[in-house]
Amino acid sequence: MFKKIKRNLKILLLLTYNSLKITSQSRQGMIFFTLGKILRFLLLFGIIFLVFSKTKIIAGWSLKQVIILYLTFNFIDTFSQVLYREVYRFRPLVVSGNLDLILVKPYHPFLRLLLGGVDLFDLLLLLPYLFLLLLFIFQENVSFFSFLLYLVLVVNGLIIATAFHIGVLGFGLLTTEIDNVIMIYRDLLNLGRFPIEIYQQVISLIFTFIIPIGVMITFPVKALFGFLSFKNIVFSFFISFFLLWLSVKLWQIGLKRYQSAGG
Amino acid sequence: MIVVKNLIKIYKIYQKTGRLITDIFFRKYEEVLALDKVSFEIGKNELVAFIGPNGAGKTTTLKILSGILFPTAGYVSVLGFFPFEKKEAFLKQISFIMGQRNQLIPDLTAMDTFLLNKEIYEIDDYQFKKNLQKLTAIFSAEKIIHQPVKMLSLGERMKMEFIAALLHQPRIVFLDEPTIGLDIFSQEAIREFIKDYQKEFKATIILTSHYLEDVKRLAKRLIIINKGKILYDGSLTAILQRFSQIKYVSLILEKKVKQEALFKIGKPIVYQLPKVIFQVEKKELPRIVAYINNKIPYLDLVIEDEKIEEVIKSLFKNQR
């Protein structure tokens, strides 16, 4: 078991190193990509301050709470993008048929298809988010238990993000039109930048129970401030593991039905 | 080593009608029978060639044997494994090379892919160095392994694909159109490489190719497949004995011979005196040779088999 983990880590490191070598070949692209992300982050930060200059509370959330939520969103979103960048390159692999040569390799294909393109430059962006997030959290009066629960629920949010990405891979085997699926995921996730309470009740329920963006982002922050009920904590874990199970099933069904290009 | 019994594969192909609503909500699928109760066995250190026209089922067979595709029905066992389960112990013993697909990372050097495969297949440093040296030497490719793959020619890239796929010394190698698109020199290099590799590593090799030259030069056993059915499974020489009904009799005449005497043999397909060539029925050959010996003065007599390409072509024609 330990040997297997060690081997997988070695492969992952090599894949990451190769990905870094490829990214660093286009330096200008890398700089503009990073600048664009920083600009987007600052603009949204500005909008939050602008809204709160007109009002003190939004849907029961104070300025600092909304900032923590926004930074939590950025952390989960960026972290899942850092890890799962390769999912965005899945369609060309299926269409070209090069996926076949990955499926005959003696390792779990997720190692390559899910984690095979870890973007270290996005990882660098994660550090200021993390710094700001911790800075704002420690300015608030939160208990150690609430903070611990917050961390656990953030990890739970990452499990949901993982399930979404595996689901996209599964869809990619059944239909090559996955670029739309991943864009829908990105658009929906973007709605999680703000507390789900700002949306109408029906939409808010959808974001909790059907497309659990609220569970991914709003729930950890609610737990941090002691707003989250025990029932919802249990539900969070249930939904993440259910989605993970469902996405792996979808992948397995996809593999069985996979027809391979030119087959 | 490889056992296949009554293998069936059905593809579901989406049929576009061109009507938007129907295409979105009432999709129609056509079922295409790609393999129809295919059975065969392949032993250790065999080099078997699968040939057939496009869509015959060659690549589908290879993809099922390597675990890429799930069979619709039938029994498949490769090295004692059901390939689709993709057990690590199984995948470590096989390799798949496709002429039109790449495992090499285009932006990096071939060596980067080799090093990645070293970890994936858990090849130790000594073995890796030894195998790499041996494989690059066969191809005389010591220098190009350090060049970015995207800068290599198709022939060079294919050589690198071979090295990447064989570094772990697989026991079974699947080759799908390995020489497609290559110039004659690269084709020759690849053929020599396959031969040398099989000899050196005692591997079982299953090859598909549209080039009969590949088959003639490499395989002793031939499996001819068309429309998902096996038409022939046997040696290259036996195919002529079994399916060829024709022989070519070529004569160089010693002196002028009356046309009527010659035409008693049959209508010649080449009549450029002193050279005359006849296409005759195999069963008629003893009678014709006796007649020539008695009645026709000649300097040279050559009897040739029908070309293997012609035999295979007529086999496919008869199946249509």
Segments the model singles out, each with a brief description of its role:
Chain B
Residues 20-23, 115, 119, 126-144:
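Conserved ABC ATPase "signature" region
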Residues 74-85, 89-91:
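Conserved ABC transporter NBD signature motif
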Residues 107, 148-155:
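Conserved ABC ATPase signature
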Residues 173-177:
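Catalytic Walker B motif of ABC-type/P-loop ATPase nucleotide-binding domains
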Residues 191-279:
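ABC transporter nucleotide-binding domain
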Residues 248-315, 320:
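Short, charged/small-residue-rich alpha-helical element at the C-terminal edge
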